[in-house]
Amino acid sequence: MAPNLRKSHPLLKMINNSLIDLPTPSNISAWWNFGSLLGICLMTQILTGLLLAMHYTADTTLAFSSVAHTCRNVQYGWLIRNLHANGASFFFICIYLHIGRGFYYGSYLYKETWNTGIILLLTLMATAFVGYVLPWGQMSFWGATVITNLFSAIPYIGQTLVEWAWGGFSVDNPTLTRFFALHFLLPFAIAGLTLIHLTFLHESGSNNPLGIVSNCDKIPFHPYFTLKDILGFALMVLPLTSLALFSPNLLGDPENFTPANPLVTPPHIKPEWYFLFAYAILRSIPNKLGGVLALAASVLVLFLSPFLHKAKQRTMTFRPLSQLLFWILVTNLFILTWVGSQPVEHPFIIIGQLASITYFTILLILFPIIGTLENKMLNF
């Protein structure tokens, strides 16, 4: 009998073991679809980004008009730009849901997979930030100024670090040029990290909604989950194209339709919606260094999840108290996102401070306590 090329060819063998004959738990739900959706997001962003880069000029005098030119004069340039800008939003929606899934079902106990995932999140955040600066509108310029300025809070080396990042004494042409270089490079770094993420995942195999070992009941990835993933793609592409075609500027800031002007500060400087929760935590501390540390901690706290897991059960499927706490955390993140978009005045300041305290309290204190309590309840 002739050997099966899919199983014998050195390259096809890798693809086969990762995407075709991969043993997969039979009971994973739609929450396990977001990994493949993130892959599609990444490919879409790289493709549209490449097409945009062909028409973009990384120069302060030309950047804004080159983007306008792309939208006006390039064949379907408006569509490519709208898909790229809104694709970023969908990327973040998918990654937040993916992390939420991992948190709910205890997937963080696969430490290597979880840690590479957090590094992926940080890289994605960096990519989105430098990308937002490229159109060189008002919010691009002032967002870059405010966020890069945060590094000056680092003791002793802060100011030097900021001027080194800027390539001068303010955000100017060198800053834009290097941000374009970084925005081009980082998505490929994300693609490389994704392969590492998947390598670690395939070492252990997928988790499942019950959180129990599922070796006795696994099915091949293809055709079952390839088909399921295609349904997922369709359900994501539909709202993405609808948003890009019907209301492409819904999630953007009107301030960015004005070319960057260092002499005029916008009344409310705020990042894109997907950074608002972290921005609210940053603003809730009246001290610069304290705010920067809280901002960093808001994401880096995820690294501690595996060590704060005290429950005997892996997932929250049969842990109602932890479930309640989880959904309070989700609501709290929505409150932080909303507060981050509001001006710094009463009552938003105190709401932001309370929500920030709640965020860290739930993650660092309440989850371990409730987990231990539920262990005790198992004995009754």
Swiss-Prot record:
Annotated residues for binding of heme b b566: 98, 197
InterPro entries attached to this UniProt entry: Cyt_b/b6_C (IPR005798), Cyt_b/b6_C_sf (IPR036150), Cyt_b/b6_N (IPR005797), Cytb/b6-like_sf (IPR027387), Cytochrome_b (IPR030689), Cytochrome_b_C_euk/bac (IPR048260), Cytochrome_b_N_euk/bac (IPR048259), Di-haem_cyt_TM (IPR016174)
Subcellular location, principal: mitochondrion
One CC-aspect GO term: mitochondrial inner membrane
Subcellular location per the Swiss-Prot or TrEMBL entry: Mitochondrion inner membrane
Xref: PROSITE patterns: CYTB_CTER, CYTB_NTER
UniProt keyword annotation of rRNA processing present: no
Residues annotated for heme b b562 binding in this entry: 84, 183
Keyword Electron transport attached: yes
Listed SUPFAM superfamilies: a domain/subunit of cytochrome bc1 complex (Ubiquinol-cytochrome c reductase), Transmembrane di-heme cytochromes
Residues that, per the record, bind a ubiquinone: 202
GO biological process: mitochondrial electron transport, ubiquinol to cytochrome c
Cofactor(s) for this UniProt protein: heme b
UniProt KW keywords: Electron transport, Heme, Iron, Membrane, Metal-binding, Mitochondrion, Mitochondrion inner membrane, Respiratory chain, Transmembrane, Transmembrane helix, Transport, Ubiquinone
Membrane topology, record value: Multi-pass membrane protein
Cofactor binding note from Swiss-Prot or TrEMBL: Binds 2 heme b groups non-covalently.
Transmembrane segments: 34-54, 78-99, 114-134, 179-199, 227-247, 289-309, 321-341, 348-368
Role noted for this protein: Component of the ubiquinol-cytochrome c reductase complex (complex III or cytochrome b-c1 complex) that is part of the mitochondrial respiratory chain. The b-c1 complex mediates electron transfer from ubiquinol to cytochrome c. Contributes to the generation of a proton gradient across the mitochondrial membrane that is then used for ATP synthesis.
Annotated family: Belongs to the cytochrome b family.
Additional observations: Heme 1 (or BL or b562) is low-potential and absorbs at about 562 nm, and heme 2 (or BH or b566) is high-potential and absorbs at about 566 nm.
Self-association and partners: The cytochrome bc1 complex contains 11 subunits: 3 respiratory subunits (MT-CYB, CYC1 and UQCRFS1), 2 core proteins (UQCRC1 and UQCRC2) and 6 low-molecular weight proteins (UQCRH/QCR6, UQCRB/QCR7, UQCRQ/QCR8, UQCR10/QCR9, UQCR11/QCR10 and a cleavage product of UQCRFS1). This cytochrome bc1 complex then forms a dimer.
Name of the protein described by the UniProt record: Cytochrome b
Organism: Macronectes giganteus
The gene coding this protein: MT-CYB
